[in-house]
């Protein structure tokens, strides 16, 4: 029985970046031997076992054969005769097909170390096209490794385009699409996930609402980049710099979906996009099974970002009305998340990345002033029933007015 560390752990170790998960492959063993050694079986479709102490995953070496459509259409073959090279051959990218033994000796039959050095994401074999999920995985690796200068090999991009052309992406479940998208939101460069999917044609299939933004013009006065799709990539990049929250990053990526359905006769203006975008966000989130926490913030940002950009013009009563609608009295962190998205939107414009965003400070000032009006003081002054809320509202507006006058 031979045990090797494989996949992302070896890749990240060689790149000098933190290793979080360790996966192992076992060559020359049977399931019975693993059970006798105290390992617990967890694999449903193929033999994967948990180590009795570390609880890390150990998989028996296996080969795969395409038997049907989609990423589930595979038959696994495992036996003590399957070699390490055969197991590594079924993997997606050369940089993920390097193994390391207990002595630290590397086994790299497919040139993964050279591709690590050259910063290339390259498929291991032509069997790459058999699994449509790999299109999304490569896009995610491009996002994860973008700061190190990685790019997708031209021949791998061609295979990704052929997978898209085959129609196999439609076999991906909503859960798998969201799983990869969500993981990409936690990478250093989430915009690369969208950019690579766009390049191979997959964005139009899995996230058509975002793909529809490319080629849609905006007023050059406010958007030097003009193209709404390019703006979306820039906003995604800025959101990742401003916040590590996947929820904030998601909301920033989808806040302008409404611009994708503006009639061309109205271009480059998008007067109704804050309203039309709401339906598209709901539709996207339902189809891809996006968690409610992500959907809710995205809807708020979509509806309010234009108002917040105009903070200098907003009347105190309008500000309080917005605070009420967002329910920031009970959820203070929500306002901060929305302002981060708006700041990313403001900075996500060609050549304007470093422009200040005083609107956030003004909204926060107004919020703190309104928050200082406590309901207890209203009750102590003799107000009862519905009059309590009305008076608190009136005092909040006055407090905001005074705070902004003194600013």
From Swiss-Prot:
<keyword id="KW-0819">tRNA processing</keyword>
<dbReference type="GO" id="GO:0000287">
    <property type="term" value="F:magnesium ion binding"/>
</dbReference>
<dbReference type="InterPro" id="IPR003607">
    <property type="entry name" value="HD/PDEase_dom"/>
</dbReference>
<keyword id="KW-0808">Transferase</keyword>
<feature type="binding site">
    <location>
        <position position="8"/>
    </location>
    <ligand>
        <name>CTP</name>
    </ligand>
</feature>
<dbReference type="InterPro" id="IPR032828">
    <property type="entry name" value="PolyA_RNA-bd"/>
</dbReference>
<keyword id="KW-0511">Multifunctional enzyme</keyword>
<dbReference type="GO" id="GO:0005524">
    <property type="term" value="F:ATP binding"/>
</dbReference>
<keyword id="KW-0067">ATP-binding</keyword>
<dbReference type="InterPro" id="IPR043519">
    <property type="entry name" value="NT_sf"/>
</dbReference>
<feature type="binding site">
    <location>
        <position position="11"/>
    </location>
    <ligand>
        <name>CTP</name>
    </ligand>
</feature>
<comment type="similarity">
    <text>Belongs to the tRNA nucleotidyltransferase/poly(A) polymerase family. Bacterial CCA-adding enzyme type 1 subfamily.</text>
</comment>
<dbReference type="Pfam" id="PF01743">
    <property type="entry name" value="PolyA_pol"/>
</dbReference>
<keyword id="KW-0692">RNA repair</keyword>
<dbReference type="GO" id="GO:0004810">
    <property type="term" value="F:CCA tRNA nucleotidyltransferase activity"/>
</dbReference>
<keyword id="KW-0548">Nucleotidyltransferase</keyword>
<dbReference type="GO" id="GO:0001680">
    <property type="term" value="P:tRNA 3'-terminal CCA addition"/>
</dbReference>
<feature type="binding site">
    <location>
        <position position="91"/>
    </location>
    <ligand>
        <name>ATP</name>
    </ligand>
</feature>
<dbReference type="Pfam" id="PF01966">
    <property type="entry name" value="HD"/>
</dbReference>
<feature type="binding site">
    <location>
        <position position="11"/>
    </location>
    <ligand>
        <name>ATP</name>
    </ligand>
</feature>
<keyword id="KW-0694">RNA-binding</keyword>
<keyword id="KW-0479">Metal-binding</keyword>
<dbReference type="GO" id="GO:0016791">
    <property type="term" value="F:phosphatase activity"/>
</dbReference>
<dbReference type="InterPro" id="IPR006674">
    <property type="entry name" value="HD_domain"/>
</dbReference>
<dbReference type="InterPro" id="IPR012006">
    <property type="entry name" value="CCA_bact"/>
</dbReference>
<feature type="domain" description="HD">
    <location>
        <begin position="228"/>
        <end position="329"/>
    </location>
</feature>
<feature type="binding site">
    <location>
        <position position="23"/>
    </location>
    <ligand>
        <name>Mg(2+)</name>
    </ligand>
</feature>
<keyword id="KW-0533">Nickel</keyword>
<dbReference type="InterPro" id="IPR050124">
    <property type="entry name" value="tRNA_CCA-adding_enzyme"/>
</dbReference>
<feature type="binding site">
    <location>
        <position position="137"/>
    </location>
    <ligand>
        <name>CTP</name>
    </ligand>
</feature>
<feature type="binding site">
    <location>
        <position position="21"/>
    </location>
    <ligand>
        <name>Mg(2+)</name>
    </ligand>
</feature>
<feature type="binding site">
    <location>
        <position position="137"/>
    </location>
    <ligand>
        <name>ATP</name>
    </ligand>
</feature>
<dbReference type="Pfam" id="PF12627">
    <property type="entry name" value="PolyA_pol_RNAbd"/>
</dbReference>
<feature type="binding site">
    <location>
        <position position="140"/>
    </location>
    <ligand>
        <name>ATP</name>
    </ligand>
</feature>
<protein>
    <recommendedName>
        <fullName>Multifunctional CCA protein</fullName>
        <ecNumber>2.7.7.72</ecNumber>
        <ecNumber>3.1.3.-</ecNumber>
        <ecNumber>3.1.4.-</ecNumber>
    </recommendedName>
</protein>
<dbReference type="GO" id="GO:0000049">
    <property type="term" value="F:tRNA binding"/>
</dbReference>
<dbReference type="GO" id="GO:0004112">
    <property type="term" value="F:cyclic-nucleotide phosphodiesterase activity"/>
</dbReference>
<keyword id="KW-0378">Hydrolase</keyword>
<keyword id="KW-0460">Magnesium</keyword>
<comment type="subunit">
    <text>Monomer. Can also form homodimers and oligomers.</text>
</comment>
<dbReference type="InterPro" id="IPR002646">
    <property type="entry name" value="PolA_pol_head_dom"/>
</dbReference>
<dbReference type="GO" id="GO:0042245">
    <property type="term" value="P:RNA repair"/>
</dbReference>
């Amino acid at each position: 029985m031979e045990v090797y560390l494989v996949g992302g752990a070896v890749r990240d170790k060689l790149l000098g970046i933190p290793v979080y998960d360790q996966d192992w492959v076992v060559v020359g063993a049977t399931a019975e031997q693993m059970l006798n050694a105290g390992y617990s079986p967890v694999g449903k479709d193929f033999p994967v076992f948990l180590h009795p102490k570390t609880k890390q995953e150990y998989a028996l070496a296996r080969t795969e054969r395409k038997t049907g459509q989609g990423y589930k259409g595979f038959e696994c073959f495992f036996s003590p005769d399957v070699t390490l090279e055969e197991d590594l051959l079924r993997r997606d990218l050369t940089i993920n097909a390097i193994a390391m033994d207990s002595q630290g000796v590397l086994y790299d039959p497919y040139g993964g170390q050279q591709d690590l050095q050259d910063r290339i994401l390259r498929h291991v074999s032509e069997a790459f096209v058999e699994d449509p999920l790999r299109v999304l995985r490569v896009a995610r690796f491009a996002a994860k490794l973008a700061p190190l200068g990685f790019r997708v090999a031209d021949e791998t991009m061609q295979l990704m385009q052929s997978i898209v052309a085959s129609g196999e992406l439609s076999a991906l479940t909503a859960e798998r699409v969201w799983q990869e998208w969500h993981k990409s939101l936690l990478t250093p460069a989430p915009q690369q996930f969208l950019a690579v999917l766009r390049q191979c044609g997959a964005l139009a299939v899995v996230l058509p609402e975002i793909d529809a933004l490319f080629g849609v013009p905006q007023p050059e006065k406010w958007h030097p980049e003009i193209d709404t799709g390019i703006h979306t990539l820039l906003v995604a990049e800025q959101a990742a710099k401003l916040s590590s929250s996947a929820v904030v990053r998601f909301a920033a990526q989808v806040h302008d979906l409404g611009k994708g359905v503006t009639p061309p006769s109205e271009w480059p203006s998008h007067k109704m996009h804050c309203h039309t975008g709401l339906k598209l966000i709901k539709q996207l989130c339902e189809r891809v099974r996006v968690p409610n926490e992500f959907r809710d913030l995205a809807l708020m940002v979509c509806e309010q970002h234009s108002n917040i950009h105009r903070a200098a013009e907003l009347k105190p009563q309008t500000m309080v009305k917005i605070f009420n609608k967002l329910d920031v009295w009970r959820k203070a962190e929500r306002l901060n998340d929305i302002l981060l998205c708006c700041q990313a939107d403001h900075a996500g414009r060609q050549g304007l990345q470093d422009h200040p965003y005083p609107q956030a400070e003004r909204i926060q000032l107004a919020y703190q002033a309104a928050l200082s009006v406590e309901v207890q003081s209203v009750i102590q002054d003799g107000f009862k029933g519905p009059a309590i809320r009305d008076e608190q509202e009136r005092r909040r507006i006055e407090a905001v007015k005074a705070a902004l006058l003194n600013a």
